[in-house]
Structures are given as C-alpha cells and as structure tokens.
From Swiss-Prot:
Lineage, highest ranks first: Bacteria, Pseudomonadati, Pseudomonadota, Gammaproteobacteria, Enterobacterales
Gene3D superfamilies: 3.30.450.40, Winged helix-like DNA-binding domain superfamily/Winged helix DNA-binding domain
Ranges of residues in domain HTH iclR-type: 6-66
Protein name: Uncharacterized HTH-type transcriptional regulator YjhI
Signal peptide: none
PANTHER family: HELIX-TURN-HELIX TRANSCRIPTIONAL REGULATOR, ICLR FAMILY, HTH-TYPE TRANSCRIPTIONAL REGULATOR KDGR-RELATED
Keyword Transcription regulation: yes
SMART domains: HTH_ICLR
Pfam families, per the entry: IclR_C (PF01614)
Organism of origin: Escherichia coli (strain K12)
Keywords carried by this UniProt record: DNA-binding, Transcription, Transcription regulation
Molecular function per GO: DNA binding; DNA-binding transcription factor activity
Any single GO BP term: negative regulation of DNA-templated transcription
Domain IclR-ED span(s) in chain numbering: 81-251
Length: 262
C-alpha cells in the first residue's frame, strides 16, 4: 500500500527502474507504458532531469543520470553485509527450523561469516563463525564456485585437492565440474553427506549489483529432514532469503522487473 502523498516518488522509482532496463525512453513511450496524466508526467520528468536523476538528449529521449550512480556508490560504501543478511537469515532459520549459515570465499576455501540456529534446531558445535571449509565437500562451497567464469573455475580446479571425507565426496575433478554445472543450471547446491555422514546441506548464491556471487547462504539438517517432498519447501524458503539479500546488495533481475508491470 502506497503512503498518502508518495505517488510522485513511486512514479519516479518506476520510471527509473524501467529506463535502467531499456536504456532510454521517450516521453510518449513512458506515457504509453505508465498511463500517467500527461502534465504530471512531463513535470515529473523535468524535475528528475533538474535533480540529475535523468538526462534528456537532443532527440527527446531520457536516460539515467549520474546522480543515481553517486547515491548508489554512497549506499554501498556504507553498507554492512550483516545489516542486509541478519533479518532474512533469522526468518529463514525460524521458518525452516534448521541452522542457517552465511559463507564467503577465502583463498581456496569457504568460511562461515554468520550462523543462526532456530529454536527448533538441534544445537551443534560442528560449525562456528570463522570456520574454514573445503569447497568441494560443502553446499556453500559449490554455490560460491558454480557462478564463477570458466577461467576462474579452471584456476580453482587446478588449485583444489579433492580430499575424500565420505563415500559421497567428489574426488574426480571432471565429475566435480559437472556437479558445478548442474548446480548452476538448477540454481542451488547440495552437500549430500559429502563432508560428514548424517548431515545434508542446501545452499543458494547471493548476487550483488554486478551480478557476481561473493556470498552464499545455506540450510543444514539431517537426511530425514529433507526426505520426500520436503526439500522443495526448504528450497523455496532458501530462494526467498537469497533473493531478499541479493536485492539488498543492489542486484536487480530483469525478469523480476518485467513481472512488476506498471
């Protein structure tokens, strides 16, 4: 629900978001898309140009102004990753009843940056903030690797030693690369008792404004938890959390924008 008196701000945001994806748009194109009153739209566009949010070229087309970049850089400069992740992770852990982790890359390892336990989850001392993890045996590691470029993947595969921990551990680099490709295609990673027996983990990547993956989140539980169709419900909770954090880091998905409509 839009707060009273905020219509102009909401309209400005929709115009900026639209132009961000199409590159530039004319007055008539914006009028046809949003169906705003003619005079109101023209006045709003003029104000946005005066403030630096839009640039109008000699052909009458509007594009994004440098003001958006300046404000975005200031916001990111002052951003604390934990301010963005804390609430979504708390909600994920509470709704799932499982342990939730935030992880990142450190050299050729993954590292836990945060850990949130649900009141319903079994307390565990097997994971802690600051713990380093081998990339090939963890869902977090796979999620962090799967969205790397092929050149980056070649580097990591050359540097990694695929040490076996259970009979499910990937020890063949060709098979591990295939697993990373499957992970990217389906959008999520799994550690199916590959690091330790009795523990299964799901993970999804977190994207930043440059469509890069620097972080990943995960849910950990025992194999029984994920039995049957339960895995789908956990993946949906995980997806919503990852999207919320990605959005907070400046990521914008074009398809998401198109679904919003006017």
């Amino acid at each position: 629900m839009v707060r009273k008196g905020c219509n102009s701000l909401v309209r400005a945001e929709k115009i900026l978001t639209h132009i961000a994806w199409v590159g530039m748009a004319s007055y008539m194109e914006l009028l046809n898309k949003f169906q705003y009153p003619k005079s109101s739209l023209l006045n709003l566009l003029n104000v946005m140009v005066d403030c630096g949010f839009l640039i109008k070229n000699k052909n009458g087309y509007y594009s994004l102004g440098i003001k958006n970049y300046e404000l975005g850089c200031q916001a990111l400069h002052r951003q604390n990753i934990f301010e963005v992740t804390k609430r979504p992770m708390q909600e994920l852990s509470l709704k799932s009843g499982l342990v939730c982790h935030l992880g990142a890359m450190e050299s050729i390892s993954a590292i836990y940056l945060d850990k949130i336990e649900s009141p319903d989850s079994v307390p565990t001392s097997k994971s802690w903030i600051g713990k380093k993890l081998e990339l090939h045996i963890t869902a977090l590691g796979k999620a962090l690797l799967a969205w790397k470029t092929r050149e980056e993947l070649d580097y990591f595969l050359e540097a990694l030693t695929l040490t076996p921990h259970t009979r499910n551990t990937f020890t063949d680099k060709k098979l591990f690369l295939e697993e990373l490709q499957k992970t990217r295609l389906r959008g999520w990673a799994i550690d199916n008792e590959e690091s330790t027996y009795g523990a299964v983990c799901l993970s999804m990547p977190v994207f930043n404004m440059y469509n890069r993956v620097n972080y990943a989140i995960s849910l950990s539980g025992d194999p029984v938890v994920y039995s049957g169709n339960k895995i789908d419900s956990y993946l949906e909770l995980l997806r919503k959390c990852a999207e919320q954090i990605s959005y907070g880091l400046g990521y914008r998905n074009e398809n998401e924008h198109l679904r919003k409509g006017n």
